[in-house]
């Protein structure tokens, strides 16, 4: 099917042609003929890189241009939202406005009403539904990317509830990797089902075992080791993507591979890699990353900072980095294809010990093999060490992906959603709640809601007992102020209960370590883990701070290993946050507490939200005397600063280090800086021309500074 055959606005056709698209892949053509341009719901289950997103783009833009209204594109990750935001910019050329919404769950974000296409994470859109944002009534089409994540234990319920709310109110398009029960999901959504295994680049799959790769067609190739699979790809001027099961392993394997890979590179390639390595900020994780990059290999995992993850992804796509060793986070929708994908580990650690990686995840990883426009064939290879290679082949290569199951019955998910139905959607009886539940994927799969009804009644009792709701003699449910605020804050009611229970102690002795320990014990945060080696030091620090904590010694009721671990994981997290707000350099925090930069940012983002939520719950409970203290602490958490730097944080391009440099140089307020001359600020370490120009523009003064080298620097001395 050619673009010219498409019965859509000419502006859509011209935009596609500007991208170099003249015709559609077979599954794209099938989807576009299925009725989605006429408003039918659709579930599109096709392989990675087969053009799922483009189908959704055309449907969204066509709907907006023909019927008005808005389109919402739901993604699972902030990084994916950023990627799609960049991709969708093309549509601004024809007059559509594109926006991205992630984070800040306590806002209606009415500004989004000015936009036509809104990209949001599932959690963000769920929070907007709870806040009753006025523009949501104008949403005519909703796309759920990675819809198979409805089966995710952590986040599936959120996506399911969004879809249940929007069914019948907007056209729904689900984009999915291959799943085991697409018919079931499509029937629930009342959607046309498009399933295909067609790929733009042929995928050749095999299993490596004891020096041989056995391909799915029965042919065999010899390789001396699994590492040789990487070196062979690089000799062919191709890239390799290796998946392992742990972060530390990703780092170790990347460093080991880089030693050999470097010998396969040209001098210009090594020069480009050295420049890349030199651009990284200094911290212990980045030191390892820089060392690996100098040898042409990088590692990628959630512990890396955002800038480092983007740097690795972009330079791997460009071919500067030759191989990437990653944990499966990289397979979650981010666009990083490679000629050869190697799955080094098919087992991973879980809460229940070692378990096999699901088939659906392995298929997603293997699906990254083959770069459209560059490769005629992509190769996906599973490394089998102790497992029977024939069984691995049958299970993963020829096996059918697992069925998806609703996660709505998970108690934490259900608790939050039941309160939201009462507090923000006006449901006032058990029957009304059950009627909503009857429209969910859970009810569709189970065919009855009896087992869920008992859980819902238990949740209602919990909400009643803890003053989130009240129930009249006529069994009418009414939300109380605590329930309404909790639902809109987008926190677990159990978190709000913990805040309520400890509020008196917080008011009596407000202190950072106590508050950080409290929020780190809530179900809304995943605290840092610790090793046996760290435990002794954590115990020592605990005795230093125990009088400032709001929770008793975990051993007070006898030894319980689960409670001990929970308590000290929260305590370690509190120590990291305390170091962060006391301006301890990131590298020192990484080294002292054995954490990664990406994890620090994740914890900081969540902690800021929970301190804000604690402040809001304090208002509801009338504890106004600590509101200002908590707001100050929230700002300190956000920026990682001591209190005296807060006034300087409103300056553009000024983070924690530049603010400290300004303060230590005598510029302690906005007024001090407004009276300074540009050359005075330029003398301060870390303050460059762009920063000074931005600061003065913020102050309403236009200053242009010619970029001259600073004569005091060693760099200038060496060049002169």
UniProtKB/Swiss-Prot annotation:
Outcome when changing residue 52 to A: No ATPase activity
GO biological process: DNA repair
Cofactor note: Divalent cations, Mg(2+) and Zn(2+) are best.
Inducing factors: Constitutively expressed (at protein level).
One Pfam family named in its UniProt record: HHH_5
GO function term, MF aspect, one: ATP hydrolysis activity
Gene3D superfamilies according to UniProt: 1.10.3380.30, 5' to 3' exonuclease, C-terminal subdomain, P-loop containing nucleotide triphosphate hydrolases
UniProt KW keywords: ATP-binding, DNA damage, DNA repair, DNA-binding, Helicase, Hydrolase, Isomerase, Nucleotide-binding
Top EC category: isomerase
Helicase ATP-binding domain mapped to chain residues: 33-197
Residue window of motif DEAH box: 145-148
Keyword Calcium: no
Chain sites annotated for binding ATP: 23, 28, 46-53
Annotated ranges, domain Helicase C-terminal: 229-422
EC code: 5.6.2.4
Cofactor(s) this protein cannot do without: Mg(2+); Zn(2+)
Recorded catalytic activity of this chain's protein: Couples ATP hydrolysis with the unwinding of duplex DNA by translocating in the 3'-5' direction; ATP + H2O = ADP + phosphate + H(+)
Subunit and partners: Monomer. Interacts with PCNA.
NCBIfam families in alphabetical order: PRK00254.1 (NF001308)
HAMAP family: Helicase_Hel308
Role: DNA-dependent ATPase and 3'-5' DNA helicase that may be involved in repair of stalled replication forks. Unwinds the lagging strand from forked DNA structures in a 3'-5' direction. PCNA, the DNA polymerase sliding clamp subunit, stimulates the helicase activity, and may alter substrate specificity. Unwinds branched DNA (Holliday junctions) in an ATP-dependent fashion; ss- and dsDNA stimulate ATPase to the greatest extent, although it preferentially binds DNA with a single-stranded region. Processes a RecA-mediated recombination intermediate between gapped circular and homologous linear dsDNA.
Assigned protein family: Belongs to the helicase family. Hel308 subfamily.
Annotated protein name in UniProt: ATP-dependent DNA helicase Hel308
């Amino acid at each position: 099917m050619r673009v010219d055959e498409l019965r859509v606005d000419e502006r859509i056709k011209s935009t596609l042609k500007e991208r170099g698209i003249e015709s559609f892949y077979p599954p794209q053509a099938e989807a576009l003929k299925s009725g989605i341009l006429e408003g039918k719901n659709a579930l599109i289950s096709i392989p990675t890189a087969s053009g799922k997103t483009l189908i959704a783009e055309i449907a969204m833009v066509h709907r907006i241009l023909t019927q008005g209204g808005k389109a919402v594109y739901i993604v699972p990750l902030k990084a994916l939202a950023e990627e799609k935001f960049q991709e969708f910019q093309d549509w601004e050329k024809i007059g559509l406005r594109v926006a991205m919404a992630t984070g800040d769950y306590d806002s209606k974000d009415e500004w989004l009403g000015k936009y036509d296409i809104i990209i949001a994470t599932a959690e963000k859109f769920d929070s907007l539904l709870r806040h009753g944002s006025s523009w949501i009534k104008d949403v005519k089409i909703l796309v759920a990317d990675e819809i198979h994540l409805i089966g995710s234990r952590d986040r599936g319920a959120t996506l399911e509830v969004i879809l249940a709310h929007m069914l019948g109110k907007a056209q729904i398009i689900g984009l999915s990797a291959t799943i085991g029960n697409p018919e079931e999901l499509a029937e629930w959504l009342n959607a046309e089902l498009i399933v295909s295994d067609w790929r733009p680049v042929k995928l050749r799959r095999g299993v490596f075992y004891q020096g041989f790769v056995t391909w799915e067609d029965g042919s065999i190739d010899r390789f001396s080791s699994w590492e040789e699979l990487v070196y062979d790809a690089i000799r062919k001027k191709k890239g390799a993507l290796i998946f392992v099961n742990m972060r530390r392993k990703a780092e170790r394997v990347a460093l080991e591979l880089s030693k050999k890979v470097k010998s396969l590179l040209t001098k210009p390639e090594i020069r480009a890699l050295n420049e890349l390595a030199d651009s990284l900020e200094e911290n212990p994780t980045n030191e390892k990353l820089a060392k690996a990059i100098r040898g042409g290999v990088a590692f990628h995992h959630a512990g890396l900072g955002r800038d480092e993850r983007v740097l690795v992804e972009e330079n791997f796509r460009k071919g500067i980095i030759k191989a990437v060793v990653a944990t499966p986070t990289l397979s979650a929708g981010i666009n990083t294809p490679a000629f050869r994908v190697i799955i080094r580990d098919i087992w991973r650690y879980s809460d229940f010990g070692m378990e096999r990686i699901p088939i659906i995840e392995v298929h997603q990883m293997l699906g990254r093999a083959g770069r459209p426009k560059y490769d005629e064939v992509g190769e996906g290879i599973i490394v089998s060490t102790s497992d029977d290679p024939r069984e691995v082949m049958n299970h993963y290569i020829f096996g059918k992906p697992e069925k998806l199951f609703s996660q709505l019955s998970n108690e934490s998910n259900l608790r939050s959603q039941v309160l939201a139905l009462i507090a923000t959607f006006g449901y006032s009886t058990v029957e009304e709640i059950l009627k909503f539940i009857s429209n969910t994927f859970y009810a569709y799969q189970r065919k009855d809601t009896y087992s869920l009804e008992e859980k819902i009644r238990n949740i209602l009792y919990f909400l009643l007992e803890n003053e989130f709701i009240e129930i009249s003699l006529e069994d009418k449910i009414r939300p109380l102020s605590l329930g309404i605020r909790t639902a809109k804050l987008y926190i677990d009611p159990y978190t709000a209960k913990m805040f309520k229970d400890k509020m008196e102690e917080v008011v009596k002795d407000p202190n950072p370590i106590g508050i950080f320990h409290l929020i780190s014990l809530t179900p809304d945060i995943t605290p840092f883990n610790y090793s046996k080696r760290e435990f002794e030091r954590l115990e020592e620090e605990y005795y230093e701070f125990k009088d400032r904590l709001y929770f008793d010694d975990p051993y007070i009721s006898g030894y319980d290993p689960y409670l001990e671990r929970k308590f000290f994981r929260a305590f370690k997290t509190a120590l990291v946050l305390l170091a962060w707000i006391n301006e301890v350099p990131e590298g020192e925090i990484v080294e002292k507490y054995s954490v990664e930069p990406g994890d620090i940012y994740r914890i900081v983002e969540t902690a800021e939200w929970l301190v804000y939520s604690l402040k809001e719950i304090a208002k509801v409970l009338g504890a106004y005397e600590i509101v200002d203290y908590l707001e100050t602490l929230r700002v300190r958490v956000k920026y990682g600063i001591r209190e005296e730097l807060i006034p300087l944080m409103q300056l553009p391009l000024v983070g924690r280090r530049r603010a400290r440099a300004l303060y230590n140089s005598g510029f302690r307020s906005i007024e001090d800086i407004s009276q300074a001359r540009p050359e005075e600020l330029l003398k301060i370490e870390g303050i460059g021309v762009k920063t000074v120009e931005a600061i003065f523009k913020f102050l309403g003064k236009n200053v242009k500074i010619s970029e001259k080298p600073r004569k005091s620097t060693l760099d200038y001395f060496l060049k002169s």
